[in-house]
């Protein structure tokens, strides 16, 4: 789903708790998608960075304050990012959580309340050793917060001030320039010892460690977010359909197929233990105002509110359940998560937002590809559950009843979700083409591999055909604001419309399917259901991601981090860089920057003619000015280095390279890089890169 992040970022710009504004997708850990991933390790690290005044590099701090709205990087000292990258990422995540909590509280919150939140997430025995948050804010975050003895006031509501990249460089500077002594409440300890212990802990822990060392209520809450979010989105869909009916049936969650959203046994058990959907909503205090809450889904904080309200719901539930029963419930959830999700890798990315994954923050572009093969195999992974319920419904109900009950609505939802991927595929193609595309060409696009990241299974194609084909779908009144569609061709109404995201597309397509199915006979509906289910079942186990993944898009992603690293380094040194020095930087000095570069990335740069050949291309002329000897960086913004900006440009660049190399040489290069990257991802020493 990270490949869709540039399509989703505008609808849910929750940038502070989470990751860089360009890449906002909701976190899905293998076990838990907790909204604020803060563990005991975070606090141990914060303890290690709260040191005497001499610990902070004053030159860097003052420079940062002056240039906080300028380019990505201020003048920073040489930093060994590789050594502290995981530690830094955890601190960044923690700072962003504080910032967003203050935003949620109208930029003002009590210091005691803030301290309480932190204390509630970790054991008291560990928290006892920490220096207070108040001290940390007063020393290092004076440009973001004003902290008195009673209040924490947010001075700036500009999310870019606490963006992941800016905070990362800032905190890394503090870590790298810390004194030898670190002040605890009651003791002093060597800084290097603290760093070493925490680094080993972060590097060696697994998700089970993270889960069991987080607040039980916090972990429990993370399992409630997806079902509740799905339920709210269904209410929106009901509203748009004119029904405005609130349903609390738990079966709606167990059969949910809302645009790629999957529910594991952990999700379903959490709903069961909270007392069902009705009980969860009732405890959240939303029973009367639920529809009003749902209508504000476009609020930036929509999912954050769901999580925080669900968290209070979990705490309230805990109060009315005996302690031994509560512990048994949590243990059951842990066991389910460990057995079902870990071994089978069934937990999937949710719909819109991504929190910072501590040990993967600075290598988002590379690491995200590792997650996709398991999470992107099919639109609906809990397929057996769906098929069994479908068969039971068919046996028990007549044709008329089958299409009047809630299960029919569930299938329409699935059908709409199958149309989302082809629509995104078409949008990516039209964005690259930047012109009207002949309808026949658009249809052929689905039948062959092209430079887009959205691989289409046969059931996607049959879903398009079942709904009348591309012209019928794109020219419908529900999508008229997105596409201009005639009998001759298809074009986008706007190249960078905020409406081109998965969530909005799903709503439009849901309306279209709901309207379209009214014109079908019961026999036609059953035929469509059986056809799509058959192809889904046949392809479920065989959809290997790397076999169909576009080589252009894959290699483009390998090139992103070298380009970002080069831009970061030239801006950092503040001068024109010799071309030979830049080439060496990629090979020997890339560990000095916040972007991890894999050997496969270096190989891609080398095989495509080196840095000069790549960055002198017109597609990157807005960032670099490159002669035969020197490279300098033009003035650029963070958006210029985002995936949504770089990927289409690099795809166009690679299409040019393919034409000059020839199909045979290109296929050989693509296969070499894919095999190389696959070996890297399977290697236990991946972190060494």
Curated annotation (Swiss-Prot):
One of its GO terms (cellular component) is mitochondrion. The keyword Mitochondrion applies. It is found in: Mitochondrion. Keywords: Mitochondrion. Its main location: mitochondrion. This is Uncharacterized protein SPAP27G11.14c. It comes from Schizosaccharomyces pombe (strain 972 / ATCC 24843) (Fission yeast).
């Amino acid at each position: 789903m990270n490949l869709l992040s540039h399509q989703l970022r505008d609808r849910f710009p929750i940038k502070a708790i989470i990751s860089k504004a360009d890449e906002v997708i909701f976190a899905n850990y293998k076990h838990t998608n907790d909204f604020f991933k803060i563990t005991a390790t975070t606090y141990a690290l914060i303890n290690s960075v709260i040191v005497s005044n001499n610990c902070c590099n004053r030159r860097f701090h003052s420079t940062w304050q002056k240039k906080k709205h300028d380019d990505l990087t201020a003048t920073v000292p040489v930093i060994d990012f590789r050594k502290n990258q995981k530690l830094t990422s955890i601190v960044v995540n923690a700072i962003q959580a504080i910032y967003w909590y203050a935003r949620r509280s109208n930029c003002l919150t009590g210091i005691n309340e803030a301290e309480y939140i932190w204390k509630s997430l970790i054991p008291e025995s560990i928290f006892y050793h920490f220096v207070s948050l108040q001290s940390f804010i007063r020393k290092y975050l004076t440009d973001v917060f004003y902290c008195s003895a009673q209040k924490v006031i947010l001075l700036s509501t500009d999310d870019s001030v606490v963006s992941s990249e800016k905070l990362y460089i800032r905190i890394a500077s503090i870590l790298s320039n810390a004194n030898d002594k670190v002040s605890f409440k009651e003791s002093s300890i060597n800084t290097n010892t603290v760093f070493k212990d925490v680094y080993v802990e972060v590097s060696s822990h697994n998700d089970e460690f993270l889960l069991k060392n987080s607040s039980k209520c916090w972990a429990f809450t993370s399992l409630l977010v997806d079902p509740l979010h799905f339920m709210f989105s269904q209410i929106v869909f009901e509203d748009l359909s004119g029904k405005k009916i609130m349903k609390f049936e738990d079966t709606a969650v167990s059969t949910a197929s809302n645009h790629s959203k999957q529910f594991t046994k952990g999700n379903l058990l959490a709903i069961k233990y909270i007392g069902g959907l009705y009980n969860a909503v009732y405890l959240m205090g939303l029973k009367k105002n639920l529809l009003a809450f749902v209508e504000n889904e476009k609020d930036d904080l929509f999912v954050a509110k769901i999580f925080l309200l669900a968290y209070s719901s979990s705490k309230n539930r805990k109060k009315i359940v005996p302690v031994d029963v509560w512990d048994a419930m949590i243990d059951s959830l842990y066991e389910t998560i460990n057995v079902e999700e870990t071994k089978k890798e069934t937990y999937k990315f949710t719909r819109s937002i991504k929190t910072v994954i501590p040990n993967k923050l600075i290598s988002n572009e590379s690491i995200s590809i590792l997650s996709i093969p398991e999470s992107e195999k099919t639109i609906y992974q809990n397929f057996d559950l769906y098929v069994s319920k479908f068969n039971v419904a068919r046996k028990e109900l007549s044709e008329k009843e089958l299409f009047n009950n809630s299960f029919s609505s569930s299938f329409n939802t699935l059908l709409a979700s199958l149309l989302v991927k082809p629509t995104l595929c078409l949008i990516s193609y039209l964005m690259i083409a930047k012109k009207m595309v002949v309808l026949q060409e658009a249809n052929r696009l689905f039948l062959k591999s092209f430079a887009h990241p959205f691989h289409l299974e046969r059931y996607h194609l049959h879903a398009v055909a079942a709904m009348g084909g591309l012209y019928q779908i794109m020219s419908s009144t529900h999508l008229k604001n997105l596409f201009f569609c005639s009998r001759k061709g298809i074009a986008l109404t706007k190249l960078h419309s905020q409406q081109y995201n998965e969530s909005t597309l799903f709503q439009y397509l849901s309306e279209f399917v709901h309207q379209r199915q009214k014109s079908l006979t019961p026999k036609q509906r059953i035929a469509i259901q059986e056809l799509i289910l058959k192809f889904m079942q046949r392809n479920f186990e065989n959809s290997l991601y790397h076999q169909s993944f576009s080589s252009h898009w894959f290699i483009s992603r390998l090139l992103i981090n070298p380009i970002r690293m080069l831009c970061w380094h030239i801006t950092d040194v503040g001068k024109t860089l010799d071309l030979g020095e830049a080439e060496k930087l990629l090979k020997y000095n890339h560990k000095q920057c916040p972007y991890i570069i894999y050997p496969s990335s270096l190989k891609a740069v080398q095989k495509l003619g080196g840095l000069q050949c790549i960055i002198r291309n017109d597609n990157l002329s807005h960032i670099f000015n490159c002669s035969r000897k020197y490279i300098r960086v033009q003035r650029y913004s963070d958006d210029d280095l985002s995936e949504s900006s770089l990927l289409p440009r690099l795809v166009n660049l690679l299409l040019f390279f393919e034409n000059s190399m020839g199909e045979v040489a290109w296929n050989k290069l693509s296969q070499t890089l894919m095999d190389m990257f696959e070996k890297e991802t399977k290697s236990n020493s991946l972190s060494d890169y």
